[in-house]
UniProtKB/Swiss-Prot annotation:
Protein name as catalogued: tRNA pseudouridine synthase A
GO biological process, one term: tRNA pseudouridine synthesis
TM regions (residue ranges): none
Organism for this UniProt entry: Legionella pneumophila (strain Lens)
EC number: 5.4.99.12
Coiled coil feature spans: none
Assembly description: Homodimer.
Active-site annotation: 51
Binding site for substrate: 109
Length: 262
C-alpha cells in the first residue's frame, strides 16, 4: 500500500529535510513518527528536499506500508508523535505508480521579506528582514526575464549536484502586502539555492543597488560569482507541489498562514 501525506513544518530548528547522521532533520522526525504508527520501520520520499532553515506549508511525501491503518490513523497518529513544529495536514492512499518527487509537474515557493525599519520580533525565524525600502514593482519587472526555460548557472550554488542547469520557470510574481514583500515563483524544478539566489538578485534591484536590466545580465553571464548574495533561508517556504489530476491530490491554500491569497 502506498500512502501520500501533505506535511507542514517550521524549518528554523532543523538541518533541512534530508536525514543526516548526527543532525536534527525533518525527515528523521517524520519517519520516526510514522514508524511508531506502523509499528515497523518506515522510509519516506519527499517532493522537494528543503535546506536548513527552510519551511514548508505543503510538502508532499509518500511511503509504502503493508500494515492496515486508516488515513485518519496515519494523520492523527503521526501528529501525536511529531514535534510541535511539524504536522501532517492531509493524506490519501495512492496507486503504485505515484511518486512524490518524480510524479510532480511543478513546485511553487514563496520568499517572504519583512521590509521595515525595525527588525521583526515575532516572525524573526519566518521572514527575511530588509530595512532598506524595496520597490516591489522593480523587482517584478526585473524577474520577468527569468520566465521560461533558461540556463540558471548564475543562480545555482557551487554545491549543486544537478546534471543540468536548465530549468523552466512557469510564473514569477513579486507583490507587497503592507510591510511584507513576497516573491512567488513556480517552476518544473529548482536547482540548489536557486530561489534564494533569485531573491538575492531581486532584492538588490528593489533596493536600487542595481538596475532592472542587471537581472538579465546575471542570467546571461552563467557565472554565480556575478550575482548577488544568497538570501537567507528563513524567508523561504515550499508552498505547493502540483501533480497530474489523475492522482487527485488536494491543493491546499499555499500559505503561510500570516499571508493571504490575492
Amino acid at each position: 500500500m502506498r500512502i501520500a501525506l501533505v506535511v507542514e513544518y517550521d524549518g528554523s530548528q532543523y538541518h533541512g529535510w534530508q536525514a543526516q547522521t548526527g543532525l536534527h532533520t525533518i525527515q528523521q522526525a517524520v519517519e520516526f513518527a510514522l514508524s511508531k504508527v506502523a509499528d515497523s520501520s518506515i522510509s519516506v520520499v519527499c517532493a522537494g528536499r528543503t535546506d536548513t532553515g527552510v519551511h514548508a506549508t505543503n510538502q508532499v511525501i509518500h511511503f509504502d506500508c503493508e500494515k492496515d491503518r486508516s488515513i485518519r490513523a496515519w494523520i492523527h497518529g503521526a501528529n501525536s508523535f511529531l514535534p510541535k513544529d511539524i504536522c501532517v495536514k492531509w493524506g490519501k492512499e495512492m496507486p503504485e505508480n505515484f511518486h512524490a518527487r518524480y510524479s510532480a509537474v511543478s513546485r511553487r515557493y514563496r520568499y517572504v521579506i519583512y521590509n521595515g525599519a525595525i527588525r521583526p520580533g515575532l516572525l524573526r525565524g519566518n521572514v527575511t528582514w530588509q530595512y532598506r525600502q524595496l520597490d516591489h514593482r522593480l523587482m517584478q519587472q526585473g524577474g520577468q526575464c527569468l520566465l521560461g526555460e533558461n540556463d540558471f548557472t548564475s543562480f545555482r550554488s557551487v554545491e549543486c549536484q544537478s546534471n543540468t542547469p536548465m530549468r523552466n520557470i512557469h510564473q514569477l510574481q513579486v507583490t507587497r502586502h503592507g510591510d511584507l514583500v513576497v516573491l512567488d515563483i513556480t517552476a518544473n524544478a529548482f536547482l540548489h539555492h536557486m530561489v534564494r539566489n533569485i531573491a538575492g538578485v531581486l532584492i538588490a534591484v528593489g533596493s536600487g543597488k542595481h538596475p532592472v536590466g542587471w537581472v538579465k545580465d546575471v542570467l546571461n553571464a552563467k557565472d554565480r560569482k556575478l550575482g548577488a548574495e544568497t538570501a537567507p533561508s528563513y524567508g523561504l517556504y515550499l508552498v505547493q507541489v502540483t501533480y497530474p489530476k489523475e492522482f487527485g491530490l488536494l491543493q491546499n491554500n499555499p500559505g503561510p498562514l500570516f499571508l493571504w491569497e490575492k
